[in-house]
Amino acid sequence: MKRSTRKQQGFTLLEMMLVVLLAGIAAGMVVMAFPPERQNDSAWQLARFQAQLEFAAESSQVNEYMLGVRIYPDRWQFYQLQRPAASERIPIPSGDRWQGYKWQPWQPHRVSASATLPEALRLELLQADGKKVDKTQSGDDPDILILPGGEITPFRLLVKSENKALSNWLQVDNTGRFVTSMSQGKKR
């Protein structure tokens, strides 16, 4: 019997299908290794807020500007104290302590300065001693101040979950130290 002397060029269909199958199995294993969705995790949301707050405090010191945070039941927003643009200058009353400065949404480079929580989570801001924060102040003023010297208004932020056992808190004391429910074993 005579064999063909022609050389094989390329891959057979079977070899190609085997490579595609192996690539699909490998991709499936990688996807299964991803962590589960963390949006509804109060500890994750609190860690996210803490990271943003620490970044804001550091940025405030480095760039020497004043920042603030407004806490809403379903979100938080960072603000920067700025003079309005020249095009929107308004006459300044003589008794205005801020001399025309206004709180504007902070827009750091490549970092989010706000977050909205899923419906299962809610925020509650307390004073550092646990008393409720009086929200009767001007609606334009932030609840938490971050000063260029590194000082942060003392507070306790609760991230409440529908399941109370899954709720967490973050506290900043008058020395600027961060304490969380995770580091304290959820003691109140």
Swiss-Prot record:
Location(s) in or outside the cell: Cell inner membrane
Keywords: Cell inner membrane, Cell membrane, Membrane, Methylation, Protein transport, Transmembrane, Transmembrane helix, Transport
Modification N-methylphenylalanine, positions: 11
Keyword Lipid metabolism listed: no
Transmembrane segments annotated in the record for this chain: 13-35
Residue ranges of the propeptide: 1-10
GO cellular component, one term: type II protein secretion system complex
InterPro entries, A to Z: N_methyl_site, Pilin-like, T2SS_protein-GspH, TypeII_GspH
Main location: membrane
GO BP terms in the entry: protein secretion by the type II secretion system
Pfam families associated with the record: N_methyl (PF07963)
Membrane association type: Single-pass membrane protein
Disulfide cross-links: none
PTM statement from Swiss-Prot or TrEMBL: Cleaved by prepilin peptidase.
Quaternary organization: Type II secretion is composed of four main components: the outer membrane complex, the inner membrane complex, the cytoplasmic secretion ATPase and the periplasm-spanning pseudopilus. Interacts with core component OutG.
Family that this chain belongs to: Belongs to the GSP H family.
Function: Component of the type II secretion system required for the energy-dependent secretion of extracellular factors such as proteases and toxins from the periplasm. Part of the pseudopilus tip complex that is critical for the recognition and binding of secretion substrates.
Name of this chain's protein: Type II secretion system protein H
Species of provenance: Pectobacterium carotovorum subsp. carotovorum
